[in-house]
């Protein structure tokens, strides 16, 4: 495929013109280095522009001659066993999706993904991973989706997902985890953008009830726990009931998959549904748990009174309410506070909202009888309705003015096109004037007065015009007494004849401009 350099001048000199040598030289150099730069499609793969699929080809490593600018690489159903710093021989700067499911991957080393820094989706599902060690994904700064389901993972290092600041979805279903990965939400390596965590069908017997309240409400909504062998407990029951009442899809969609083991004695147990009425009489028992939820977003106007209700599911009986403002100020019932008031039923009133009052307010509902409390985060936005209304009014006026101008223009155009600009009387006078002018032309161009001709003659010769011009004798020698017209008069006569004659006037035109003597009769 490549060409030797010393043969290039000979080819260029023999075939190509001097003006095209540089262009052909550039093209031939491109052909020479092309395969090394762009890569080819390996025989074990299927390539489609920026997508390469090498599935079920018994591969143990990534082919080295792949196109480096691919965006999606599928290596599933192969026998790749170890991910180290050299398992990908080249750098894929634009690769955003890497699929490695159904391989024999047993471990991942630090630096395994240094050649794929821009991955957004990594699929390592259905492999043989047992542990995820510290910071093995730290190079993947923009990773958004990580799939690790259907492995043998029994331990997650607290720093295993350190550096994944953009991670939004993490799938850990179908593994051997025995503890809920609380480090994903609290601590040094927490993932602030994680909105979906699937730890279903693991081996988790209980939940850390005293720490689950630290998880923000927006992240709680995306935790899936179904299919785990929970031990029946009123705290867990209350947590799931709270999520169910708040219509969390993680509980609503998998209601019948939440079960627990109820021990009748030390040897025998049975599986029962967690989300059922009168479960273990938990509605009246002491729970000693804390829960957190994300409340509504309220819009307030500057200076207009706003009331916000505490959307707690603990019930109002034996429940006390307090609010915590954005500045961590405590707002309690029966206490005079500037611009704020809290009722005993948990409602918060802001008498005259200001811009600085906007933020997240936390309502804490505490049930003393059951030692149960819930925190509901409510967002309050404050805006100036007068300013926004004036801007909207100005926009409406501008739009209305533009529309009115367009309609007026269309009406004027229609009037100009379809309405007669001159009245009928004016039109009659104009037709009479045109008739007089036509008679005048006829009198000039006809051999005699128009009144002398009979009606039949006028009718027969209505479409013809004859021009009688005074012939001038040319005194120059050689003309034999012939007469001719001046060039300027010939042009004038020709213009008159062309504008007034029909197809039948060709004979009279020829007679006028012939070389035969023209004799005017008296």
Swiss-Prot record:
Extracellular side: 40-398
Record flagged with keyword Transmembrane: yes
One of the GO biological process terms: positive regulation of synapse assembly
Gene3D superfamilies (alphabetical): Immunoglobulins, Ribonuclease Inhibitor
Domain LRRNT residue range list: 40-68
Domain LRRCT: residue ranges: 228-284
One Pfam family linked to the record: ig
Tissues expressing the protein: Highest levels in breast, ovary, cervix, and uterus. Lower levels in lung, colon, and rectum. Differentially expressed in 56% of thyroid, 57% of pancreatic and 45% of stomach cancers.
Region (Disordered): 501-522
Cytoplasmic side: 420-522
Glycosylation site residues: 58, 104, 281, 288, 345, 373, 381, 384
Disulfide bonds: 41-47, 45-54, 232-260, 234-282, 310-363
Keyword flag Repeat: yes
Signal peptide residues on this chain, from the entry's feature table: 1-39
GO cellular component terms attached to this protein's record: membrane; nucleus; plasma membrane
Keywords for the protein's UniProt record, in alphabetical order: Cell adhesion, Cell membrane, Disulfide bond, Glycoprotein, Immunoglobulin domain, Leucine-rich repeat, Membrane, Nucleus, Repeat, Signal, Transmembrane, Transmembrane helix
Membrane topology type: Single-pass type I membrane protein
Domain Ig-like C2-type positions: 289-379
Protein location: Cell membrane; Nucleus
Role of this protein: Required for depolarization-dependent survival of cultured cerebellar granule neurons. May mediate homophilic as well as heterophilic cell-cell interaction with AMIGO1 or AMIGO3. May contribute to signal transduction through its intracellular domain. May be required for tumorigenesis of a subset of gastric adenocarcinomas.
The family this protein is said to belong to: Belongs to the immunoglobulin superfamily. AMIGO family.
Subunit architecture: Binds itself as well as AMIGO1 and AMIGO3.
Protein name (database record): Amphoterin-induced protein 2
Source organism of this protein record: Homo sapiens (Human)
High-level lineage: Eukaryota, Metazoa, Chordata, Craniata, Vertebrata
